[in-house]
């Protein structure tokens, strides 16, 4: 008798427990805890940085790596992201950092990013990244590299726009289908109840 309440309580706690992130959702070589992704102190570079992170990531740790820049659009694909730890990286302040600087400029909590300093080029060494002007970043790149970086950023934004449009189209299609099913169900119920109502009315008149 006493074991049943304990068993019911255990089942209730299991049902109320927050779902854990599946192992496949955590990119190697990072470690994940709930919506926090820790990729710090992994020796990551531009080439070895994971191509994507779980979309529900709220905190991303990239400190103490060998990152000189981030792939364009990487942080923009994380709508729930609230904080990114970017310190202790050898940031090269050129046109490839324009997407990161734009992302930082739109963050309300700028105090977390005031320690990001440029390591290269020599003209910008020691400068705080959030306070480096866009023109200075563009000037640090060759024209060809600047055009290539802009093209990559535009392609990333285009892909994101297409994905959003596709999701919106699927949602609208689903809503139309549900509305049509509800309308058909209502028509079917009316066709079934109408003869009964007519029969009841006829019986009362006789």
Curated annotation (Swiss-Prot):
Alphabetic keyword roster: Blood coagulation, Cell adhesion, Disulfide bond, Hemostasis, Leucine-rich repeat, Membrane, Phosphoprotein, Signal, Transmembrane, Transmembrane helix
GO MF, one example: identical protein binding
Topological domain spans for side Extracellular: 27-150
Modified residues (Phosphoserine): 186, 191, 200
Annotated InterPro entries: Cys-rich_flank_reg_C, GPIb-IX-V_Complex, LRR_dom_sf, LRRNT
Annotated transmembrane regions: 151-171
Gene expressing this chain: Gp1bb
Pfam families cross-referenced by the UniProt entry: LRRNT
Ranges per topology, Cytoplasmic: 172-206
Quaternary structure and partners: Two GP-Ib beta are disulfide-linked to one GP-Ib alpha. GP-IX is complexed with the GP-Ib heterodimer via a non covalent linkage. Interacts with TRAF4.
Main localisation: membrane
Bridged cysteine pairs (disulfide): 26-32, 30-39, 93-118, 95-141
Modified residues (Phosphothreonine): 193
Protein name: Platelet glycoprotein Ib beta chain
Organism: Rattus norvegicus (Rat)
Limits of the LRRNT domain: 27-55
Cited function: Gp-Ib, a surface membrane protein of platelets, participates in the formation of platelet plugs by binding to von Willebrand factor, which is already bound to the subendothelium.
Additional information: Platelet activation apparently involves disruption of the macromolecular complex of GP-Ib with the platelet glycoprotein IX (GP-IX) and dissociation of GP-Ib from the actin-binding protein.
Subcellular location, record wording: Membrane
Domain LRRCT: from-to ranges: 89-143
GO cellular component terms, semicolon-separated: glycoprotein Ib-IX-V complex
Signal sequence, start to end: 1-26
Membrane protein topology class: Single-pass type I membrane protein
Domain of life: Eukaryota
Annotated LRR repeat ranges: 60-83
One GO biological process term: cell adhesion
